[in-house]
Amino acid sequence: MTEQASSSAAGAVRSRVDRTDIAAAVLIACFVALALHGVWGQDATSDERHYFGAGLEILRAHAWTGYGARLHPPLSYYVQSLPLVWLGESSPDDPVALFPCRATSLLVFGVPLLVVAFRWARELCGPAAALVALALIVFSPTVLAHAPLLTPDVPLAATGTLALYLFHRADHGAGRPWGWGLALGLCLLSKASAWLFAAALVIDAVVMAWRRRDRGILLRVAAGVLLSYAVLLVGYGFNGLLDTKGKTELIARVPDLPLARTAAHIASPFFPLPYLKGVATQLGVGWGGWESYLVGELSRNGWWYYFLVALAVKETIACLLLLAASLIAFRWRQAGREELLLLLPPLLFFVVFSLGRVQIGIRYVLPAFPMMFIFVSSLARLRERWTRVAIGLLLAAHAAAALRASPDFIAYFNELAGGSKNGYRWLADSNLDWGQNLTRVRAYARERGIAIEPDVLPSTGLVAVRANRLVGIGDPETYRVLRETYDPVDNVGYNWLIYDLARKRGSARRQ
């Protein structure tokens, strides 16, 4: 009788696991379909024009001469350029070349990200939590918007999540470091801000070593970090590692920030010159600032609350409610090592970028989203029936919001912002207008015979203006009259606003 009961229980577990895996496969297939639908026929974004084909250029010339190639480490460039090996050199304006490159990036980085998040959540909180975490990522408009793009944001999310997951599997540094060390190396090769993942890992290891009174953890973590450093060198082909002249010239151009040049002197002998150039470029941009837009204001210094506002209007309301519920339900005094490892990356990304001067898109904190969603999935452990029903309803609402937003995921804004049609009132740049709908607006304008961004507004008729120019980025005066006197009568992809100059607003009001 006992054997029969055990066999029945084991069969039930296998059946549940099988159902969970099938559900996960369906969700991943939905993610791929939605993401590819989002970029089908979409123009290359501003950043993609810099990065397109950069990997092929680097491999052929063994040099980082292009502007895009100097901005970030090369892993995403290598992978995203793979189709061009067969298609040959092309242009980002050629959809025959652009779409395969985007699909490759999605399959190599986006899909593994989902698999890792699913497995991590299942190991921590069970199969129900795994599906919660997976659904949150799959139907996140932000993730769907950026997963297929030829940019390093989702590659960083994928490699960073993998590194921390393998670190978790290695008992937070107490186990062998080879797996997470290799993954951390790939993470460092993904984007300059990968050091935030490395910092989270090291902080977690230090806490673990202190709690266990085990210095051996620090030695094993040091070995893993050295392995990641070796992967970084190989990824750059050791290019410029011994170029002392180039490094000396670079240090002289490092922004005069506190300790920046001292740090550059210390680090320069150990890193490839192209990597140092990328870091210096990012520091220069970060120190000089970038014109940002937030709720009717322009600034080159940014706002400490920019990314909090961006999260509040760029993710679905259902997702925000689940996030709030997880923070309220979490027993902070009983926080363990797993919670620490999940919470550190979101905390570091939001704090560091909120203090910075480059605030042009929620994508800067996107790499921390998977850990945030895995943390939220812990709600699935609550046993009350009503909580499970509520979670299911909120996930359904989350998915419905993403489906309604398709294919315009970049321009998604939730109901708190008044929907995507009012996104331009809140944010701009890569949150909304990244050059993705130029072909669509040209077709729209041809059909209706309207002007696109005229330098001088006509006295009557229809005009189309993209959101970035409308809100005044780079030129606050040309379209001031539209902002203050008119409301749009239509839009194309939400980032191009259509105005009828014969229909003024009832009273002048600053938008």
Located regions from the model:
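Transmembrane alpha-helix segments characteristic
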Residues: 26-28, 324, 334-354, 482-486
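Short acidic/glycine- and proline-prone juxtamembrane loop motifs at membrane-interface regions
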Residues: 45-46, 145-155
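Transmembrane-helix motifs of polytopic, lipid-linked glycan transferases
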Residues: 103-124, 162
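Membrane-interface transmembrane helices that cradle and orient dolichyl/undecaprenyl
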Residues: 163-177
